[in-house]
Regions:
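Pocket-lining segment of extracytoplasmic ligand-binding domains
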Residues: 90-92, 101-102, 131, 167-257, ...
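Structural recognition of the beta-strand scaffold that forms the well-ordered cores
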Residues: 64, 86-89, 124-126, 145-146, ...
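Short, low-complexity disordered leader/linker segments with a strong preference
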Residues: 1-30, 324
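Segments of small-molecule ligand-sensing domains
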Residues: 247-324
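N-terminal (or domain-start) structured segment
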Residues: 25-95, 104
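Bilobed "Venus flytrap"/periplasmic-binding protein-like clamshell domains
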Residues: 32-58, 62-63, 121-184, 278-279, ...
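Acidic, polar ligand-binding/catalytic clefts
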Residues: 83-119, 195-198
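Extracytoplasmic
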Residues: 30, 42, 60, 70-73, ...
Length: 324
């Protein structure tokens, strides 16, 4: 009797192990995945937390979101193989690939491969109405928060101000901390390049009367001439409650990238999970409205991961996929 019971237990244990193995993704996949996201209070952070939950369910392996300073830190972590997935803006990715950004120290970062388009990053400026700031030009001599030093805004906004001949006092930091600072009147304005609605802008507007400072047509032209990677961008009216007309600005596109060493079938499964669950992605953040296959053509800089390229080919996406 004891022998029969022991055999039954062994069989049940074997079935359990096999079942767990089947539930843990493919045998040649990593045991876990980590996504490099951004600062708390930012779009990358919210998007990444939700994406990690989605992929954990769909891939049957634990996927974690890691808070970072943004694209520059994400690219460095990916190159060092400390994370396997990351969010980048294509402008910063271009600097990394070519080793041209000051932050690269001349080093080329080429471990990243494009997987899927995320959304446009419009640059947005906001001040409290009581500040008396009426335009971007008025930011001279004002205290302006621009997010983490390694984020897209932290890289680009100092250049914007130089090009536009505006001289504010710049403060970097996590978006949640900067939002507290402007709420306490320790800052005069915030400038951000992020998917709209930007979480901290929306939160501030719920408690304060705010003003969105639009770039003039001349300023848009000056920025695009100096920084050709910038495109024209529009934040639609109604994105924020007090934004009653379209907000014209410049922007960069965001992409999710993967380490080139990730298995092709895993990256294929990631693309499938994201595109097949668009409604859930939209619930994570409204900016995911642009996380659709057709927008893969927005990437003209990075090679696509072979697994992602196979997904676009199989799904008959229109366009040319840049691969290795």
């Amino acid at each position: 009797m004891t022998t029969i019971s022991s055999r039954i237990l062994i069989i049940l244990a074997a079935v359990f192990v096999l079942t767990k193995a089947a539930q843990s993704g493919e045998a040649h996949w990593p045991a876990t995945l980590t996504i490099g996201t951004g600062s708390p209070g930012g779009t990358y952070y919210d998007y990444g937390e939700g994406l990690a939950r989605l992929l954990t369910r769909k891939l049957n392996i634990p996927v974690f979101a890691r808070s970072t300073e943004g694209p520059t830190e994400n690219i460095k972590l990916l190159e060092a193989d400390e994370i396997q997935l990351a969010f980048v803006t294509l402008g910063v990715a271009q600097q990394a690939w070519n080793g041209t950004g000051e932050w690269t120290g001349g080093k080329q970062f080429r471990a990243m491969r494009a997987v899927f388009p995320m959304y446009d990053t419009p640059f947005q400026f906001m001040a409290l109405q009581e500040s008396g700031i009426l335009s971007v030009t008025d930011l001279t001599d004002k205290r302006v928060g621009i997010g983490p030093q390694g984020g897209t805004t932290g890289i680009y906004m100092p250049e914007f101000f130089k090009i536009l001949k505006i001289n504010p006092t710049i403060q970097t930091g996590n978006w949640s901390d900067l939002a507290v600072a402007i709420q306490a009147r320790a800052l005069d304005a915030l400038a951000v390049g992020a998917g709209a609605p930007f979480p901290e802008f929306a939160a501030l507007e719920r408690k304060n009367k705010v003003r969105y400072l639009a770039l003039t047509a001349g300023q848009v032209t000056a920025l695009r001439q100096a920084l050709p990677e910038l495109g024209s961008s529009v934040v639609p009216a109604g994105t924020y409650p007090s934004l009653t007309r379209p907000y014209q600005t410049v922007g960069l596109y965001n992409f999710a990238v993967a380490h080139r060493a990730l298995p092709d079938d895993l990256v294929y499964a990631i693309a499938e999970a994201v595109f097949a669950n668009h409604e859930e992605m939209m619930q994570i953040h409204y900016a995911a409205a642009d996380t659709v296959p057709a927008n893969f053509t927005r990437n003209t800089i990075l090679p696509f991961h072979d697994g992602a390229a196979r997904w676009y080919h199989n799904k008959s996406s229109s366009g040319v996929v840049l691969g290795d």
